[in-house]
Protein backbone atom coordinates (compact mmCIF):
# COMPACT_ATOMS: atom_id res chain seq x y z
CA UNK A 1 0.00 0.00 0.00
CA UNK A 2 2.85 2.39 0.86
CA UNK A 3 4.48 1.72 -2.50
CA UNK A 4 1.25 2.60 -4.29
CA UNK A 5 0.94 5.85 -2.35
CA UNK A 6 4.58 6.69 -3.04
CA UNK A 7 4.06 6.16 -6.79
CA UNK A 8 0.90 8.25 -6.61
CA UNK A 9 2.67 11.21 -5.00
CA UNK A 10 5.65 10.92 -7.35
CA UNK A 11 3.43 11.06 -10.44
CA UNK A 12 1.64 14.13 -9.10
CA UNK A 13 4.96 15.93 -8.64
CA UNK A 14 6.04 14.98 -12.16
CA UNK A 15 2.85 16.25 -13.77
CA UNK A 16 3.12 19.64 -15.52
CA UNK A 17 1.27 22.50 -13.92
CA UNK A 18 -2.33 22.51 -15.04
CA UNK A 19 -3.04 25.36 -17.43
CA UNK A 20 -5.52 27.93 -16.24
CA UNK A 21 -8.42 28.14 -18.64
CA UNK A 22 -10.26 31.33 -19.55
CA UNK A 23 -14.00 31.61 -20.04
CA UNK A 24 -14.59 30.62 -23.71
CA UNK A 25 -17.61 32.91 -24.03
CA UNK A 26 -15.57 35.90 -22.81
CA UNK A 27 -12.66 35.03 -25.10
CA UNK A 28 -14.95 34.79 -28.13
CA UNK A 29 -16.78 38.04 -27.31
CA UNK A 30 -13.52 39.98 -26.90
CA UNK A 31 -11.96 38.36 -29.97
CA UNK A 32 -14.86 39.77 -31.97
CA UNK A 33 -14.00 43.24 -30.68
CA UNK A 34 -17.08 43.44 -28.47
CA UNK A 35 -17.20 44.26 -24.76
CA UNK A 36 -17.64 41.46 -22.24
CA UNK A 37 -19.31 42.62 -19.04
CA UNK A 38 -20.61 40.89 -15.94
CA UNK A 39 -24.08 41.72 -14.65
CA UNK A 40 -25.24 40.87 -11.14
CA UNK A 41 -28.62 39.23 -10.74
CA UNK A 42 -30.57 37.59 -7.88
CA UNK A 43 -29.36 34.26 -9.27
CA UNK A 44 -25.70 35.25 -9.41
CA UNK A 45 -23.34 36.94 -11.86
CA UNK A 46 -24.09 36.63 -15.57
CA UNK A 47 -21.58 37.32 -18.33
CA UNK A 48 -22.93 39.30 -21.26
CA UNK A 49 -21.52 40.40 -24.59
CA UNK A 50 -22.36 43.94 -25.68
CA UNK A 51 -22.97 43.98 -29.43
CA UNK A 52 -22.35 46.92 -31.80
CA UNK A 53 -26.05 47.81 -31.66
CA UNK A 54 -25.82 48.26 -27.89
CA UNK A 55 -27.70 45.08 -27.04
CA UNK A 56 -26.24 42.98 -24.23
CA UNK A 57 -26.83 39.29 -24.85
CA UNK A 58 -25.95 36.26 -22.75
CA UNK A 59 -22.30 35.61 -23.61
CA UNK A 60 -22.64 31.83 -23.58
CA UNK A 61 -25.71 31.94 -25.83
CA UNK A 62 -23.80 34.19 -28.24
CA UNK A 63 -20.77 31.89 -28.23
CA UNK A 64 -22.96 28.85 -28.88
CA UNK A 65 -24.82 30.58 -31.69
CA UNK A 66 -28.18 30.62 -29.95
CA UNK A 67 -28.59 34.38 -30.38
CA UNK A 68 -27.33 37.23 -32.57
CA UNK A 69 -25.98 35.12 -35.43
CA UNK A 70 -25.74 38.23 -37.58
CA UNK A 71 -22.95 39.51 -35.29
CA UNK A 72 -21.03 36.22 -35.23
CA UNK A 73 -17.59 35.58 -36.67
CA UNK A 74 -19.16 33.43 -39.37
CA UNK A 75 -21.39 36.25 -40.58
CA UNK A 76 -18.53 38.77 -40.54
CA UNK A 77 -16.47 36.47 -42.74
CA UNK A 78 -19.34 35.93 -45.18
CA UNK A 79 -20.08 32.36 -44.04
CA UNK A 80 -23.43 30.94 -43.04
CA UNK A 81 -23.74 30.87 -39.24
CA UNK A 82 -25.50 27.90 -37.75
CA UNK A 83 -26.26 26.60 -34.26
CA UNK A 84 -25.92 22.82 -33.97
CA UNK A 85 -26.22 20.18 -31.29
CA UNK A 86 -23.96 17.17 -31.76
CA UNK A 87 -21.69 14.82 -29.82
CA UNK A 88 -18.37 16.61 -30.33
CA UNK A 89 -19.54 20.00 -29.08
CA UNK A 90 -22.98 19.36 -27.53
CA UNK A 91 -24.27 22.85 -28.40
CA UNK A 92 -22.14 25.14 -30.54
CA UNK A 93 -21.86 27.65 -33.36
CA UNK A 94 -20.45 26.40 -36.65
CA UNK A 95 -19.53 28.23 -39.82
CA UNK A 96 -20.59 26.64 -43.09
CA UNK A 97 -17.64 26.99 -45.47
CA UNK A 98 -18.00 27.32 -49.27
CA UNK A 99 -17.19 23.61 -49.68
CA UNK A 100 -20.03 22.66 -47.34
CA UNK A 101 -17.90 21.80 -44.32
CA UNK A 102 -19.22 22.86 -40.92
CA UNK A 103 -16.41 24.06 -38.64
CA UNK A 104 -16.82 25.03 -35.00
CA UNK A 105 -16.21 28.76 -34.65
CA UNK A 106 -13.47 28.57 -32.01
CA UNK A 107 -11.51 26.11 -34.15
CA UNK A 108 -11.89 28.23 -37.28
CA UNK A 109 -10.75 31.36 -35.43
CA UNK A 110 -7.87 29.52 -33.80
CA UNK A 111 -8.96 30.64 -30.34
CA UNK A 112 -7.01 29.49 -27.31
CA UNK A 113 -8.67 29.39 -23.91
CA UNK A 114 -5.42 28.98 -21.99
CA UNK A 115 -3.94 31.91 -20.13
CA UNK A 116 -1.22 33.59 -22.18
CA UNK A 117 1.86 35.60 -21.23
CA UNK A 118 3.81 38.04 -23.35
CA UNK A 119 6.93 36.43 -24.72
CA UNK A 120 5.60 32.87 -24.97
CA UNK A 121 5.59 33.01 -28.76
CA UNK A 122 1.81 32.87 -29.05
CA UNK A 123 -0.31 35.90 -29.91
CA UNK A 124 -3.22 35.18 -27.61
CA UNK A 125 -6.03 37.26 -26.20
CA UNK A 126 -5.68 39.94 -24.86
CA UNK A 127 -2.29 40.48 -26.56
CA UNK A 128 -1.88 42.53 -29.73
CA UNK A 129 0.89 44.25 -31.72
CA UNK A 130 0.79 47.27 -29.40
CA UNK A 131 0.85 45.44 -26.05
CA UNK A 132 3.11 42.55 -27.04
CA UNK A 133 5.02 42.94 -30.34
CA UNK A 134 7.19 39.97 -29.31
CA UNK A 135 4.26 37.62 -29.92
CA UNK A 136 2.03 39.58 -32.30
CA UNK A 137 3.41 40.72 -35.64
CA UNK A 138 2.39 43.76 -37.68
CA UNK A 139 -0.58 43.11 -39.93
CA UNK A 140 -1.71 40.12 -37.90
CA UNK A 141 -5.39 39.75 -37.00
CA UNK A 142 -5.20 40.54 -33.29
CA UNK A 143 -8.01 43.03 -32.70
CA UNK A 144 -5.66 46.02 -33.05
CA UNK A 145 -5.10 48.26 -36.09
CA UNK A 146 -1.37 49.05 -36.09
CA UNK A 147 -1.51 50.94 -39.45
CA UNK A 148 2.20 50.28 -39.99
CA UNK A 149 3.31 51.02 -43.56
CA UNK A 150 4.76 47.62 -44.42
CA UNK A 151 2.85 46.56 -47.53
CA UNK A 152 0.45 44.44 -45.48
CA UNK A 153 -3.19 45.42 -45.15
CA UNK A 154 -4.04 44.97 -41.47
CA UNK A 155 -7.39 43.09 -41.30
CA UNK A 156 -8.18 44.84 -38.00
CA UNK A 157 -8.25 48.29 -39.65
CA UNK A 158 -11.38 49.90 -41.01
CA UNK A 159 -11.48 51.74 -44.33
CA UNK A 160 -8.92 54.56 -44.44
CA UNK A 161 -7.01 53.58 -41.27
CA UNK A 162 -4.22 51.60 -42.96
CA UNK A 163 -2.54 53.18 -45.99
CA UNK A 164 -1.47 49.73 -47.14
CA UNK A 165 -5.10 48.75 -47.63
CA UNK A 166 -5.72 51.77 -49.86
CA UNK A 167 -2.54 51.04 -51.84
CA UNK A 168 -3.57 47.43 -52.28
CA UNK A 169 -6.78 48.60 -53.88
CA UNK A 170 -4.75 50.74 -56.27
CA UNK A 171 -2.32 47.91 -56.98
CA UNK A 172 0.67 49.81 -55.58
CA UNK A 173 1.60 47.55 -52.70
CA UNK A 174 2.63 43.96 -52.38
CA UNK A 175 -0.33 41.66 -52.83
CA UNK A 176 -0.96 39.43 -49.86
CA UNK A 177 -2.43 36.10 -50.87
CA UNK A 178 -5.34 35.06 -48.71
CA UNK A 179 -5.10 31.60 -47.23
CA UNK A 180 -7.92 29.35 -46.18
CA UNK A 181 -7.82 28.29 -42.57
CA UNK A 182 -7.75 24.51 -42.34
CA UNK A 183 -9.35 23.16 -39.16
CA UNK A 184 -6.66 21.55 -37.04
CA UNK A 185 -6.96 18.77 -34.56
CA UNK A 186 -8.14 20.07 -31.20
CA UNK A 187 -5.28 19.95 -28.71
CA UNK A 188 -5.92 18.66 -25.24
CA UNK A 189 -4.72 20.93 -22.46
CA UNK A 190 -2.31 19.71 -19.76
CA UNK A 191 -4.99 20.41 -17.16
CA UNK A 192 -7.34 17.80 -18.57
CA UNK A 193 -4.52 15.28 -19.01
CA UNK A 194 -3.62 15.73 -15.35
CA UNK A 195 -7.20 15.03 -14.28
CA UNK A 196 -7.25 11.85 -16.35
CA UNK A 197 -4.05 10.61 -14.70
CA UNK A 198 -5.39 11.40 -11.23
CA UNK A 199 -8.61 9.53 -11.98
CA UNK A 200 -6.64 6.48 -13.12
CA UNK A 201 -4.50 6.56 -9.97
CA UNK A 202 -7.59 6.83 -7.78
CA UNK A 203 -8.94 3.69 -9.44
CA UNK A 204 -5.65 1.86 -8.75
CA UNK A 205 -5.80 2.85 -5.09
CA UNK A 206 -9.39 1.64 -4.78
CA UNK A 207 -8.49 -1.75 -6.25
CA UNK A 208 -5.44 -2.04 -3.97
CA UNK A 209 -7.55 -1.39 -0.87
CA UNK A 210 -9.97 -4.15 -1.81
CA UNK A 211 -7.14 -6.66 -2.11
CA UNK A 212 -5.66 -5.76 1.28
UniProtKB/Swiss-Prot annotation:
Q: Does Signal appear among the keywords?
A: yes
Which keywords does this Swiss-Prot/TrEMBL entry list?
A: Signal
Name it.
Uncharacterized protein AF_1947
Secretion signal span: 1-20
What the entry lists under InterPro entries is as follows: DUF333
| Species assigned in the record | Archaeoglobus fulgidus (strain ATCC 49558 / DSM 4304 / JCM 9628 / NBRC 100126 / VC-16)
- Name the Pfam families on file: DUF333
Amino acid sequence: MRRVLLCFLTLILLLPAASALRNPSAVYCEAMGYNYVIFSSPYGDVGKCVLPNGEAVNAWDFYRGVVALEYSYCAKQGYEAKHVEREDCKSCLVCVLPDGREVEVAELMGLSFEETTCGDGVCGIPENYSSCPQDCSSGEEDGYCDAVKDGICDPDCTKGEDADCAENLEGGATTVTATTITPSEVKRTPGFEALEVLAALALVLAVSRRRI
